């Protein structure tokens, strides 16, 4: 039975990656051994996890938790929280670190905003994170659909809404005007890593374009908190990390997340290095000294992990294990 499951999982991963070209992975003979601190705690009672999954399936919705193989899925689902992924489950880009399906996406589901709102109401949650696949096939990159989702959710629910958006191909003026119709409480766009590695890690993205999106949104909608995140372990240097944090802060970002990159499968980019806990603590100290209100740094930290906690509670200590 286990062998059959392994085969099915392998086939699913290969199907996701059949268009992605990742160089030199076949030449990697040894995989880095995971250190002791890279351990995922599985809850004993999984009934809540299946309840969330069934609610998503029932309404034909997606969670980035599942699609991106997030290590925190069990904990978050067990606590009744999920990060919803709109605009389908197929991404138009082929970032080799990401487990989300890549290819030609389906047409936008105009019923999704209302289904999303109804599901959030049924789940009874008070903080919502919405993200999406990259939709370079759409003129506005999906911005109008984000707005429609925000409207639908707020019409039925008294919740705070955080959106984690793509770069919209740099159509910043268009995007800013569209979001004037409905604003989130937090605007998040992940920078992911250092500019030197962008071509390898984020083909199709541009470091300065991402910074400009964050800066422009903050200038136009100053009441909305702006947020960004990095994943480490792909070959970046300490001095580069510090410079990225300074660039983000200069662009108006006040909330920061920094986590460890974990290879979704053998077909994705390999981990170059596992960051020790002490280094995450140092990164957090540096971020707070730069001026960030909140800096959440640790191996399992993700942009939407404990997002409601991140959004309103300034953290001025270095205990990453309290998160």
UniProtKB/Swiss-Prot annotation:
What class does this enzyme belong to in the EC scheme? transferase
Q: Which residues bind [4Fe-4S] cluster 2?
A: 91, 95, 98
Bound cofactor: record note:
Binds 2 [4Fe-4S] clusters per subunit. One cluster is coordinated with 3 cysteines and an exchangeable S-adenosyl-L-methionine.
Question: What molecular function does GO assign, one term?
Answer: 4 iron, 4 sulfur cluster binding
- Name what cofactor the protein needs: [4Fe-4S] cluster
Q: Which NCBIfam families match?
A: lipA, PRK05481.1, PRK12928.1
Please identify the protein, giving its name as recorded. Lipoyl synthase
Native organism: Buchnera aphidicola subsp. Acyrthosiphon pisum (strain APS) (Acyrthosiphon pisum symbiotic bacterium)
């Amino acid at each position: 039975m286990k062998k059959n499951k392994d085969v099915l999982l392998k086939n699913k991963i290969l199907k996701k990656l059949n268009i992605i070209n990742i160089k030199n992975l076949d030449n990697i003979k040894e995989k880095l051994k995971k250190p002791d601190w890279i351990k995922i705690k599985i809850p004993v009672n999984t009934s809540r996890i299946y309840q969330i999954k069934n609610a998503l399936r029932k309404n034909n919705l997606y969670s980035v938790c599942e699609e991106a193989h997030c290590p925190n899925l069990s904990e978050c689902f067990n606590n009744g929280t999920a990060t919803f992924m709109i605009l389908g489950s197929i991404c138009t880009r082929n970032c080799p670190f990401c487990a989300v399906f890549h290819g030609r996406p389906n047409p936008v589901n105009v019923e999704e905003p209302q289904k999303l709102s109804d599901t959030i109401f049924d789940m009874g949650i008070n903080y919502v994170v919405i993200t999406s696949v990259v939709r370079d096939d759409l003129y506005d990159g999906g911005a109008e659909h984000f707005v429609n989702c925000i409207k639908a959710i707020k019409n039925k629910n008294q919740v705070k809404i955080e959106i984690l958006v793509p770069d919209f191909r740099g159509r910043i003026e268009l995007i800013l005007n569209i979001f004037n119709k409905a604003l989130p409480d937090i605007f998040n766009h992940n920078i992911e890593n250092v500019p030197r590695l962008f071509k390898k890690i984020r083909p199709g993205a541009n470091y300065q374009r991402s910074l400009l999106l964050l800066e422009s949104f903050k200038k136009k909608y100053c009441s909305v908190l702006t947020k960004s995140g990095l994943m480490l372990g792909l070959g970046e240097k300490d001095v580069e990390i510090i410079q990225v944090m300074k660039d983000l802060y200069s662009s108006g970002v006040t909330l920061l997340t920094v986590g460890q990159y974990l290879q979704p499968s053998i077909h994705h980019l390999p981990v170059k290095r596992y960051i020790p806990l002490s280094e995450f603590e140092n990164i957090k100290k540096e971020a707070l000294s730069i001026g960030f209100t909140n800096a959440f740094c640790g191996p399992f930290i993700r942009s939407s992990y404990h997002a409601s906690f991140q959004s309103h509670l300034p953290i001025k200590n270095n205990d990453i294990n309290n998160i």
